[in-house]
Amino acid sequence: MAEQILVTTTENIPGRKYEIIGEVFGVTTQSKNAIRDFGAGLKSIVGGEIKAYTSMLTESRDQSIARLRQNASEMGANAVVMMRFDSGSIAGDMQSVVAYGTAVKFID
């Protein structure tokens, strides 16, 4: 059921009326590992994309959206509008990604 929750970055869903349930979040935090750090250190010398970190952030983003959908479903929502991401480092070796928005329920 949670995977059926519509998630959009827009404020409105054309052709749909809904009531606001409230704010909803999906959070994930991942730690870096020694292999990634070693590769990142080498890559920072020569420049270029650090694919291991890009992959970690992409995975974190996907997990945070899945958790956002699950939390919205538990609130009785059909959709999440105005979804945004925020991310940051924790203690220099962890990365946190938050997906957040407004949970809404469609009015038929």
UniProtKB/Swiss-Prot annotation:
InterPro entries for the chain: UPF0145_dom_sf, UPF0145_YbjQ-like
Pfam families: YbjQ_1
PANTHER family: UPF0145 PROTEIN SCO3412 (PTHR34068:SF2), UPF0145 PROTEIN YBJQ (PTHR34068)
Family: Belongs to the UPF0145 family.
Protein name per the record: UPF0145 protein LJ_1287
Organism of this sequence: Lactobacillus johnsonii (strain CNCM I-12250 / La1 / NCC 533)
